[in-house]
């Protein structure tokens, strides 16, 4: 069904707008150990992302799809319309209608407030990739700030790795029998708003979301042994984003208060990024990232120490590295990401993730326990059409 929609969408657009741009991607992940459920070490995937963009002064059309095929894990296969919207621009407002992706947040390591779109949970370890969300969005720009009002038409359930996949829970996820607290199930219309403004060097945003939680809880599956079923509850979440720029220092913070997902809880990510411009009298910039995480539901508050090298060359070369430290459970995670353009046609990126855990059973809640055999290196090659 979705493939038919893709074809029907692409062909008229090609006739109207001409050439289709896009990306072809080859992705290979090598895991250093066999998985806890005897999954293979080597996983590769191909993806194709066609895209069309047209800006006619007071009207904008955007189409982007993503099709992914994984060599081992059927759970990573994806046919998704990520953008298919029309924006009408008026003198005092903008109206967007269609499928789109909206990002909220200012911090680097955990985007607490970012809730409009469902996470593409099989794409990356950081959870930053999103699925398209049908919506109507009205944007009002006034002297007191920018107000975005959303009607979110229907719900996208989270995707999970299959039984042959990596970076998955020890128990399989029974996605097909997902449960909902709303009688409308995945047809419920959710609502959200976000107000944002800036005052000199201070950026601030306040948001509220009322609808089906993008993050499920898990219950024992009634018809599968050793399996869990996602349970999506109706929640209310209020969020605050703050970013203050002081020369080369950026102080950032996000905090949410959520009800409906079990007991009401508060979660926050806050920290700073200090940038050394012209590091060691070169053209490179070096950024130091320090962020702390808090969640009322967890007994520990892991923090992140990271660096970001920007080479400022014609190839847009960058290296990002960081340690995730959980002092109470004595866990340590390390992440390395590097990317570099190859001419104007291609991009090569590398990613490495390492988990370290003490063998000591100290009685503390473990964050990485399910991933202790999932240290990996990932290479991704993108060809721009």
Kindly give the residue locations of the regions a language model identified.
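Outer membrane beta-barrel
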Residues: 53-166, 200, 353, 357
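Residues on the lipid-exposed face of transmembrane beta-strands in outer-membrane beta-barrel proteins
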Residues: 48-54, 83-88, 136-140, 193-197, ...
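Outer-membrane beta-barrel "beta-signal"
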Residues: 272, 354, 371-385
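Outer-membrane beta-barrel translocator domains and adjoining extracellular loop/strand segments
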Residues: 32-43, 72-80, 108-114, 160-166, ...
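Detector for outer-membrane/organellar transmembrane beta-barrel domains
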Residues: 211, 246-327
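Repeated loop/turn-to-beta-strand initiation elements of outer-membrane beta-barrel proteins
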Residues: 20, 57-63, 92-95, 144-147, ...
């Amino acid at each position: 069904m979705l493939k038919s929609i893709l074809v029907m969408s692409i062909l008229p657009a090609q006739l109207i707008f001409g050439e289709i741009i896009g990306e072809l991607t080859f992705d290979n992940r090598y895991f250093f150990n066999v998985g806890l459920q005897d999954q293979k070490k080597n996983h590769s995937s191909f993806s194709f992302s066609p895209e069309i963009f047209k800006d006619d002064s007071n009207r904008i059309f955007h189409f982007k799809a993503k099709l992914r095929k994984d060599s081992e894990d059927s759970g990573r296969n994806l046919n998704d319309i990520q953008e298919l919207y029309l924006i009408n621009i008026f003198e005092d407002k903008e109206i967007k209608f269609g499928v789109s992706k909206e990002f909220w947040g200012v911090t680097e390591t955990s985007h607490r407030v970012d809730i409009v779109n469902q996470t593409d949970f099989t794409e990356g370890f950081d959870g930053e990739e999103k699925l398209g969300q049908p919506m109507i969005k009205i944007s009002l720009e006034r002297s007191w700030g920018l107000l975005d009002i959303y009607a979110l038409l229907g719900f996208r359930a989270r995707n999970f790795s299959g039984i042959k996949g990596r970076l998955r829970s020890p128990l399989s996820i029974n996605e097909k029998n997902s449960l909902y607290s709303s009688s409308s199930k995945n047809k419920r219309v959710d609502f959200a708003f976000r107000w944002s403004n800036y005052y000199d060097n201070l950026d601030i945003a306040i948001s509220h979301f009322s609808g089906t939680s993008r993050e499920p809880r898990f219950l024992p599956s009634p018809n599968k042994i050793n399996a869990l079923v996602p349970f999506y509850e109706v929640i209310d979440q209020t969020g605050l984003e703050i970013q203050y720029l002081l020369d080369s220092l950026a102080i950032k913070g996000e905090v949410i208060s959520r009800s409906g997902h079990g007991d009401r809880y508060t979660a926050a990510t806050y920290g700073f990024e200090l940038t050394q411009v012209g590091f060691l009298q070169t053209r490179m910039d070096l950024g130091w990232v320090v962020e702390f995480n808090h969640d009322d539901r967890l007994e520990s508050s892991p923090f992140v120490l990271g660096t970001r090298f920007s080479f400022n060359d014609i190839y847009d070369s960058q290296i990002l590295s960081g340690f995730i430290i959980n002092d109470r459970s004595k866990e340590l995670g390390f992440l390395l990401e590097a990317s570099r353009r190859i001419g104007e046609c291609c991009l090569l990126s590398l990613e490495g993730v390492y988990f370290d855990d003490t063998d000591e059973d100290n009685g503390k809640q473990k964050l990485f326990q399910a991933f202790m055999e999932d240290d990996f290196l990932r290479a991704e090659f993108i060809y721009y059409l």
